[in-house]
Design a protein with these regions (language model features):
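Short, charged beta-turn/beta-strand-edge "cap" motif at the junction between a beta-strand
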Residues: 19-22
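Ferredoxin-like alpha/beta domains used as RNA- or RNAP-binding modules
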Residues: 1-10, 17, 27-100
Length: 100
């Protein structure tokens, strides 16, 4: 694990910094060794998550939404819930970037 990167856990929101999905926002839904399992509910669903090395993502925030709580507790999460949550969080991040 990279000592310069914060510890990324299940239910964290991350942004891809490498690869063709660079700039996309994902939820961390699991781990497989050195890989994170990422889903956004659109092109990367819960049924077919993206496997990506931790060094290729950057932690955006530790989410405290209902979706994050479901991921942590192991409850069923729908792809639509992921999409809505990430759209809401992305709008908030864009507003912060614009000084709003």
């Amino acid at each position: 694990m990279d000592p310069d990167k914060p510890d990324i856990q299940i239910s964290d929101v991350v942004i891809s910094v490498q690869g063709r999905d660079q700039g996309e926002v994902f939820y961390v839904i699991g781990r497989e060794g050195e890989y994170l399992l990422l889903a956004n509910g659109k092109n990367r669903t819960l049924e077919a998550p993206k496997r990506k090395k931790q060094k290729h993502v950057e932690k955006v925030l530790r989410s405290e939404t209902r979706v994050a709580a479901k991921l942590l507790s192991g409850d069923k999460v729908l792809n639509g819930e992921l999409r809505r949550d990430l759209a809401f969080l992305s709008r908030g991040m864009q507003a912060n970037d614009l000084g709003g």
